[in-house]
Regions:
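Extracellular/periplasmic, surface-exposed regions of secreted and cell-surface proteins
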Residues: 1-36, 50-378, 517, 521, ...
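A structural signal for short, well-ordered beta-strand segments and their strand-loop junctions
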Residues: 20, 39, 458-460
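Conserved small-residue
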Residues: 107, 330-438, 476-478, 497-499
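Glycine-rich, charged/polar anion/phosphate-binding loops
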Residues: 251-253, 431-434, 441-446
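Glycine-rich, aromatic-lined ligand/substrate-binding cores of catalytic
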Residues: 437-471
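C-terminal beta-barrel architecture of Gram-negative outer-membrane proteins
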Residues: 457-532
């Protein structure tokens, strides 16, 4: 249930002054029922010519869960907007807001001796379970004040200052409130007479320079850590024949924990030429976050006997740029537009709470402060072993004198030249997928649209780059966990009938235990995950109104569209938009096709 009540008042005694009141209440109730039946699978034994049965999901069971959540929000604001002397435009906002959110849940589970009735009352009382998900039981309240003043002079000089003063119930008294100011300025240089009245520059329709700086607070990473508490159940203990569940100590409270601050600086420009025939937007940005939560490492001995609390210790920095280029034109009845975008973002750990380095090598190898978060460590690659002789004359890399190595195995680089392949030969030579915000380092795309005499077409391309994917488990080696092998492992090192090794793309097949020599992350098994995808295409035709109005239809458009039509990528088994699928268990991306019409009377 979602409800919203809004009331607006315009003051008759002062031009431009208005007040607005808003109250919203949302309530959700979620009921879940899972009935899991016991089933039997049969596996054929070729040698004995029999089918062996195995029972799964035994015994049958039923799970019921009830969840409810409520959220309310109140806003009250004063707005003042006025144009003075046809030149000075002033807008002022002052707003008060508060919100509260709470959730609760309960679940139960029973096993069945007979599963004819799929209701929880029909289950067995023996070994029944009832509980609640602790992460879905909470109550949070926020309050805040917002102020904003916006001024522009003839749409040429623009300025805005604002602030937020926010409070959160998640923090202790004295640390609940945070003040977060921001400001921005803009200068439409195209409105200056030396451009508007200078004929050689008449092609400049709009040129705006802008800069902004703002601070924001975030309380989402902490919940009531200033309170002492317990986790239940903790460890269990046996006294006599009875098992008693215990309480687990949550750790030391921290009454000083508070908002972490995010400070963002943005500098950019907007440019339109020839009435929008060409356009460009360029932005450079820096976002510095201070007070990220972390636990002290190495400063407090483990003999303290308690888990340390989180504190506002860590810092990071996002920086990058974004470029958007556009072109639109009309040639007789043909209209078209093209938009291209490219962005590069990297995240750097400015300070990461970690123990002191033992030496300079330990600092280089194991510490992450002042380093980019997308930096990945791996062995360098010298290809594959081509023969047993090649293995014997190369540094040992399995720790067993080469006893588990075979031709076709990955040949790791002896990076430090000590004749031994170990962890000391790992170095930063790959890029992880993400900047910790779910996006690759580079993103790019294109939007193309065209229209001609009622026909229209729209295309959306999307891509990413600057990151790698490494295959694991069933994509990395055959017979994983005693299962089968995927078809791409046919292209592997193998022996012919005379015992000669035939080269292949993958190492030779053997049992998983002796395959572990090929598990290590190395450049050879690290794939460039850059991609370009045709995300969507839509083609439509709008029937002329002089035809549709005969049938009392104002507008009729017929269309067909498709999504995820093709992808250009070096990855064969993983969707580059979801590189977390590098274990091979995610459902492949689907192509979707739709046909329909838009009708209005």
């Amino acid at each position: 249930m979602n409800t919203t009540f809004t009331l607006t008042y315009k003051a008759p005694f002062l031009k431009g002054l208005s007040a607005k009141f808003l109250y919203a209440y949302d309530y959700k109730n979620y009921q879940q029922k899972e009935f899991q039946k016991q089933y039997t699978l049969y596996k054929y034994d070729r040698e004995k010519d029999v089918y062996n049965s195995q029972i799964y999901s035994s015994p049958s069971s039923i799970y019921r869960k009830s969840w409810e959540g409520a959220q309310n929000q109140l806003q009250a604001s004063l707005n003042y907007e006025r144009l003075f002397a046809e030149k000075h435009n002033l807008k002022v906002l002052f707003l008060y807001e508060q919100s509260a959110k709470e959730e609760d849940n309960l679940w139960a589970k029973r096993n069945f001796e007979m599963d004819a009735v799929d209701e929880i009352f029909a289950g067995s009382e023996e070994e029944q379970i009832g509980n609640a998900d602790a992460g879905q039981i909470y109550r949070v309240t926020n309050m805040g004040l917002v102020g904003r003043v916006n001024y522009d002079y003839q749409s040429k000089y623009l300025a805005e200052v604002s602030f937020r003063y926010d409070g959160s119930s998640k923090f202790a008294k004295g640390h609940r409130w945070g003040f977060f100011p921001s400001a921005s300025v803009g200068y439409r240089i195209s409105e200056e007479s030396f451009i508007k009245e200078f004929a050689p520059l008449s092609f400049i329709t709009n040129w705006k320079l802008r800069a902004s700086y703002g601070a924001m607070g975030d309380d989402g990473s902490s919940s009531y850590q200033y309170l002492s508490g317990y986790d239940y159940p903790g460890a269990s203990y046996v006294f006599g024949d009875v098992v008693y569940k215990g309480l687990g100590f949550r750790g030391l409270p921290n009454e000083l924990i508070t908002w972490y601050k995010s400070k963002t600086l943005n500098v950019g420009t907007d440019l339109d030429l020839w009435n929008g025939m060409l356009s460009a937007q360029v932005d450079f940005f820096w976002r510095y976050r201070d007070g990220l939560l972390g636990k002290r490492s190495g400063e407090v001995p483990g003999t303290i006997g308690a888990e340390l609390p989180e504190e506002n210790l860590n810092q990071d920095l996002y920086k990058g740029f974004e470029i958007v280029l556009g072109h639109r034109n009309k040639i007789n009845d043909f209209n078209y537009s093209v938009s291209l975008n490219f962005a590069l973002t990297r995240r750097q750990n400015r300070h990461l709470e970690e123990g002191d380095a033992v030496n300079s090598y330990d600092r280089w190898r194991n510490k992450y402060s002042n380093r980019y978060s997308d930096m990945g460590w791996a062995y360098g690659s010298n290809g594959q072993f081509t023969s047993m002789e090649d293995i014997w004359r190369s540094p040992i890399q399995d720790g067993q004198g080469g006893a588990t190595q075979l031709p076709g195995d990955w040949k790791y680089e002896d990076w430090n030249g000590d004749g031994i392949i170990d962890d000391s030969d790992v170095y930063p030579n790959v890029y992880e997928h993400t900047n910790d915000n779910g996006n690759p380092k580079m993103t790019f795309g294109a939007t193309i649209a065209a229209e001609w005499k009622g026909f229209d077409v729209n295309l959306l391309f999307q891509g990413g780059g600057g990151f790698n994917v490494i295959y694991f488990e069933q994509l990395q080696y055959p017979l994983c966990f005693g299962g089968n092998g995927l078809a791409h492992f046919y292209d592997r090192y193998r022996q012919d009938e005379n015992g000669n090794w035939i080269p292949g793309k993958w190492p030779t097949t053997r049992d998983a235990g002796s395959y572990s020599v090929n598990y290590a992350r190395c450049k050879q098994t690290t794939y460039d995950a850059s991609y370009l995808r045709l995300k969507s295409v839509e083609i439509g035709y709008t029937i002329p109104q002089h035809i549709t109005r005969k049938f009392k239809v104002d507008r009729l458009r017929i269309f067909a569209n498709g999504y995820n039509l093709f992808t250009l990528s070096n990855l064969d088994f993983v969707d580059p938009e979801h590189p977390e699928g590098n274990y091979g268990y995610l459902y492949p991306i689907m192509r979707n096709f739709n046909f329909g019409l838009n009708l209005s009377f």
